[in-house]
Swiss-Prot record:
Organism of derivation: Shewanella halifaxensis (strain HAW-EB4)
Protein's UniProt name: Trigger factor
Subcellular location: Cytoplasm
Chief place where the protein resides: cytoplasm
GO molecular function, one term: ribosome binding
Described function: Involved in protein export. Acts as a chaperone by maintaining the newly synthesized protein in an open conformation. Functions as a peptidyl-prolyl cis-trans isomerase.
Cited PANTHER family: TRIGGER FACTOR CHAPERONE AND PEPTIDYL-PROLYL CIS/TRANS ISOMERASE, TRIGGER FACTOR-LIKE PROTEIN TIG, CHLOROPLASTIC
Gene Ontology, cellular component aspect: cytoplasm
Residues covered by the PPIase FKBP-type domain: 160-245
Catalytic function, reaction form: [protein]-peptidylproline (omega=180) = [protein]-peptidylproline (omega=0)
EC id: 5.2.1.8
Free-text note on domains in this protein's UniProt record: Consists of 3 domains; the N-terminus binds the ribosome, the middle domain has PPIase activity, while the C-terminus has intrinsic chaperone activity on its own.
Gene Ontology biological process terms from the UniProt entry: 'de novo' cotranslational protein folding; cell division; chaperone-mediated protein folding; protein transport; protein unfolding
Key words of the record: Cell cycle, Cell division, Chaperone, Cytoplasm, Isomerase, Rotamase
Length: 434
């Protein structure tokens, strides 16, 4: 086998590989003989079909298959010999199989050589927070609102009420698509509508007709409405006031608390909030570390890896549409290219951090991650056992553990400053509610 390597552009490489043509010819002959013994063709006894007949019928297909196998096998031998690390599958261009040698070209990308830089320049503002009794009180109020019952109220609508309304929206006197509804149920203060809409309904009574003027946000999803001032003609059909459950032992049973009453419920809420806070704090620090790592290291990315990641993201996006996805056109790749490129870059850089620090997933950390995740379920031990019995899930958790260890390794050389933050404000921002 003769091999020549050519750098075409960036990470792309072109291998020209030449092998004796007899590699193909001898294998083709053996395959034709084997097929002749198995073939069932009218006019010939089983096992007695002439090779020439098989060649005429199946020769091209057999030759193509064997040529592909020869190219794949010799390509693997060539990249091992040349110490090349392909990123993605190669494209093969076969030459003629006539003559003494068979020559083909394999075009592919390689992984970039990553040399980590600027790790000491990564800066992290490490947030610190704790769950207070006031935070638990706030969560209990949220739970009360979630379990509220509603009844018709003969008074002006107020925050927390449900309002049934008809509305028609217009811009410069012209109605716009999606701006009209009848008997629309809206909980005032929920933030479901654009700013100013819900507060504009407050203070009015059932039977009243009125107009409110609001401005669509600049980042509104509908391009034709961004930043536009709209007038909504509203008819308030009904006001329903919320009846909140009392905070007592009976209330605690709604959440599976059978012993200990409200004190036990508060303890469970505090524990859950503390777990969520710890996860959010770690995620915040991790994001800062990865942002710093990406900013400090500019590396060339294989297009094949980006394309592969685009397909993963596109598939995940389509799955979120559920049954509707079958009737939707394929989402364009450019929607995901930027995110895919970042994920590829982060993966390559973290891979080098793991390699440089000779990191291996720690068993104790893996089990701690599984236990933490399982604690949110009714029967944690069942979830832990399920994970430990599933190698694919275990490998996923090992990858998570390795990523954590890599982030911790980067934190050792980063510049850290602590900043105390408010629990509610921090969690709202972390969950996108701010």
């Amino acid at each position: 086998m003769q091999v020549s390597v050519e750098t075409t552009q960036g990470l792309e490489r072109r291998l020209t590989i030449s092998v004796p043509a007899e590699q193909i010819e001898n294998t083709v002959k053996e395959a034709l003989k084997s097929e002749a013994k198995r073939a069932r063709i009218p006019g010939f006894r089983p096992g007695k079909v002439p090779v020439s007949v098989i060649n005429k019928r199946y020769g091209n297909a057999i030759r193509q298959d064997i040529t592909g196998e020869v190219m794949q096998r010799n390509f693997i031998e060539a990249i091992i010999a040349e110490k090349l690390n392909p990123a993605g599958a190669p494209t093969f261009t076969p030459g003629s199989t006539e003559g003494e040698n068979f020559e083909f070209v394999a075009t592919f990308e390689i992984y970039p050589e990553v040399e980590l830089k600027g790790l000491e320049s990564i800066t992290v503002e490490q947030p610190t927070a704790e769950v207070t009794e006031a935070d638990v009180d706030s969560m209990i109020e949220t739970l009360r609102n979630q379990h509220a019952t509603f009844e018709v109220a003969e008074r002006a609508a107020a925050e927390g009420d449900k309002a049934k309304i008809n509305f028609v929206g217009s811009i410069d006197g012209e109605e716009f698509e999606g701006g009209k509804a009848d008997d629309f149920e809206l909980q005032l203060g929920s933030g479901r509508m654009i700013p100013g809409f819900e507060s504009g309904v407050e203070g009015h009574k059932a039977g009243e007709e009125f107009n409110i003027e609001v401005t669509f946000p600049e980042d509104y999803h509908a391009e034709n409405l961004k930043g536009k001032v709209a007038t909504f003609a509203i008819t308030l059909n009904e006001v329903q006031a919320a009846n909140l459950p009392e905070v007592n032992d009976e209330f605690a049973t709604l959440f599976g608390i059978t012993e200990g009453g409200i004190d036990a419920l508060r303890g469970e809420i505090s524990k859950n909030m503390s777990r969520e806070l710890e996860q959010a704090l770690k995620a915040n620090v991790k994001e800062q570390v990865l942002n710093g790592l990406v900013e400090q290291n500019d590396i060339e990315l294989p297009a094949a890896l980006i394309d592969g990641e685009v397909e993963v993201l596109r598939k995940q996006a389509m799955q979120r549409f559920g049954d509707q996805a079958a009737n939707m056109p394929e989402l364009p790749a450019d929607l995901f290219t930027e995110q895919a490129a970042r994920r590829v870059k982060v993966g390559l850089l973290l891979g080098e951090v793991i390699k440089a620090n000779e990191l291996k997933a720690e068993d104790e950390r893996v089990q701690a991650l599984i236990a933490s995740m399982a604690s949110a379920y009714e029967d944690p031990s069942e979830v832990v056992a399920y994970y430990n019995g599933n190698e694919e899930l275990m490998q996923n958790m090992r990858n998570v553990a390795l990523e954590e260890q890599a982030v911790e390794a980067l934190l050792k050389t980063a510049t850290l400053t602590e900043k105390a933050v408010n629990f509610e404000e921090f969690m709202n921002k972390a969950t996108g509610r701010a």
